[in-house]
From Swiss-Prot:
PANTHER family: GLUCOKINASE. Keywords: ATP-binding, Cytoplasm, Glycolysis, Kinase, Nucleotide-binding, Transferase. It comes from Rhizobium rhizogenes (strain K84 / ATCC BAA-868). This is Glucokinase. It is found in: Cytoplasm. CDD domains: ASKHA_NBD_GLK (cd24008). Disulfide bonds: none annotated. InterPro entries: ATPase_NBD, Bacterial_glucokinase, Glucokinase.
Amino acid sequence: MPELNHSEAPLPFPILIGDIGGTNARFSIVVDAHSEPAHFPIVQTANFKTIDDAIEEALSKSAVRPRSAILAMAGPVRGDEIPLTNCDWVIRPKTMIANLGMEDVLIINDFEAQALAIAGISEEHRATIGEISEGMVASRAVLGPGTGLGVAGLVHAQHAWIPVPGEGGHIDLGPRSERDLRIWPHLETIEGRISAEQVLCGRGLQNLYHAICKTDGIEPSLKEPADITAHALAETNIQAEETLTLFVTYLGRVAGDIALVFMARGGVYITGGISQKILPALQKPEFRAAFEDKAPHTALLKSIPTHVVTHPLAALSGLTAYARAPASFGLATDGRRWRR
């Protein structure tokens, strides 16, 4: 791929790569631009007071000390103290440089890392939904229902991949069918509003299930999202089955909207643990039908492939790709990179 001309120097190797979630933190180290990353055991965030402590624990299992770090985290990156969503850690890059002996630290949004990953994702690490398997060499989009609903674009321009983070998970989600109109009054809202994330995430699955039960006039019997999906996939609970069917339908609607926003002719990718667990439901007709139901642009949506990312460490693979060849990506680093 032709490279962009960047005046900014690449981060020095070895580079620590980190994907920081609310529950788990995953680290690896990349020694140089040609070596495979060495992965460390998954770290539970609750077991460490600070991220620096967690990094020290990971590095205690390696003879290699990193000169720099690229970390992906949930939430916006602002200022010199960056609190994590759903975790008590606060990332302080200047302190990290001083305490861990690093020269350079770059912090980006977690879905930017997911967007970086889909730039070069191989066929073995994706499951295609629908009949279209290959898209154009063009912009892409990624969505991920998890703790929340992450959304990012990956714009292809000037011979490079440019990740575009945002808060697309908070777009409005409204009823369209008669059944939707009966269910919607029972959904929990935030300040009277129902966003996509209110339905399309782990707690959103619970929200939808409880609303369906209230609509049907029955007491909910399932508590956890995993229980709902398990009963739905096993076809042992009618309300759970409808919950999952509507979940993938609404995800298809939102994915289609995001595809239009980014003109994602290169494909739309669904990532995260939930999507992998409900893959059989996503491969049923409802997801693609909702994705394509975007008159007057139905023909356009029919031409756009959709995939579920099955790579177990997708974010780390995206960060590694950037670490090896930063000039191939148009990643904005202003206000997010700290040097000694």
